[in-house]
Amino acid sequence: MQVTLAVLSATALALLAISCGGSPAAPLAAPSPSVDLAGTWDGTGVDSQGATTVTWALRQTGTSVSGTVATKSADADGSCNSCHRNKTGTFSGTIAGTTLALTIFFAAGVDGDPTPACTATLTGTATSTVADMLTTAYSGADSCEGQFLNGTLVMARHR
């Protein structure tokens, strides 16, 4: 009986020592984004107000994406839509897994903007960020022309 009690006591002390030993685990590093969107992208945007050619120049730090945007109307020069679709602006976005949430903003008063009194903002989500292709659903508004709905951007990256 004394031997059994001694063995049980020794085993309990050994388990206690093992469970208290060692250092705490180091914190896990933040996961790296699963997509890299840095670079120059060209494509087209089509929404309820018309079609636009689009160029992005993007930088990426971790899961944050930023850069510049230039758009040019697919309509003939001189049309109302051509004025409101020829703009330069800013791009900001956040990556979560393989999804990109983005905002594009066109400020009023930009040099060379044919409609300098108008601002425009669009927001969208790209759930298909495969290699050098990206498809984004978007919506937004132009302060002079109103809302644009049911938009789709299809972009390809230059390599």
Across the structure, where does each feature detected by a protein language model lie?
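Sec-dependent bacterial lipoprotein signal peptides
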Residues: 1-19
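Intrinsically disordered, low-complexity segments enriched in Ser/Pro/Gly/Ala and basic residues
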Residues: 8, 18, 22, 31, ...
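Bacterial Sec-dependent N-terminal signal peptides
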Residues: 16-38, 159
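Central antiparallel beta-sheet cores of small beta-barrel/beta-sandwich binding domains
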Residues: 33-125, 145-158
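Low-complexity, intrinsically disordered Gly/Pro/Thr-rich segments
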Residues: 129-144
